[in-house]
A protein has these predicted regions:
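Short, Lys/Arg-enriched segments at the junction into DNA-binding effector domains
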Residues: 5, 118-138
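Two-component/phosphorelay signaling modules centered on CheY-like receiver
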Residues: 13-32
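Acidic, metal-coordinating helix/loop segments flanking the phosphotransfer/catalytic sites
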Residues: 33-51
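Acidic catalytic/metal-coordinating carboxylates
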Residues: 36, 62-65
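Short amphipathic alpha-helix used as the core "switch/output" element in two-component signaling
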Residues: 42, 64-75
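Active-site residues of response regulator receiver
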Residues: 55, 83
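The feature encodes the CheY-like receiver
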Residues: 59-62, 87
Length: 138
């Protein structure tokens, strides 16, 4: 089973640590964390990331704007937004910014895990998927 690199972006340290702890129980994930949109943007430029989980309310810029910047820079992997605001308008803004999914806090971990796996499966089947064989990336 391939290991998928997930970047978790949230300024709430306790939530970030709890999610990393839960996801680390599964051998299928390699986990990294960031506290801001700026850190996330730099991270996805420097490293291969298979999926980003990104909070909307980040200290340096709105998470949706961070996603927009990542997409403009060519980031193709799935992005799941986390938000405390569940309005339809908020969801539309996130999806239009380039997010693939929207999860409203509080959420059940099992639901987030199922969405992560579904987006990874879908992305692997798409033309945008990146494959590594030894030192080569395709």
């Amino acid at each position: 089973m391939p290991v998928h690199h997930i970047l978790l972006v949230d300024d709430d340290q306790s939530l970030r640590e709890a999610l990393i702890e839960q996801l680390a129980l599964y051998d299928e994930f390699k986990l990294s964390a960031a506290e801001s949109s700026g850190q996330a943007i730099q991270f996805v430029q420097d490293q291969r990331v298979d999926l980003v989980i990104m909070d909307v309310g980040l200290p340096d810029m709105d998470g949706r704007e961070g996603v927009r910047v990542m997409r403009k820079a060519g980031f193709k992997s799935p992005v799941i937004m986390l938000t405390g605001q569940g309005s339809d308008a908020d969801t539309v803004l996130g999806l239009e910014a380039g997010a693939n999914d929207y999860v409203v806090k509080p959420f059940k971990f099992a639901v987030l895990l199922a969405r992560i796996r579904a987006h990874l499966r879908q992305h692997e089947a798409s033309e945008d998927a990146v494959f590594q064989v030894g030192p080569y990336t395709f």
